[in-house]
């Protein structure tokens, strides 16, 4: 599966940036998402999207406030990574 995804990404010239946290989404005139503002070691950078933005950001298992708000039960264990803090979900909700 990953081979097929990797091949399609390379064939289409799609750029993937790792370790590049998104600070906020950029909206266009009709409120569509037109790009992102990233922030890293080199400072903030605006990145325009040609055909869309994919938020591959995980869940919110490490965000206590969001768990209280959205989970009906109180799970004891989770298999998520520490980076699942709901940042991407909150950015999309802010639109």
Report the location of each language-model feature.
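Conserved redox-cofactor binding core of oxidoreductases
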Residues: 1-44, 50, 64-65
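Glycine-rich loop(s) and the adjacent beta-strand/alpha-helix scaffold that form part
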Residues: 40-95
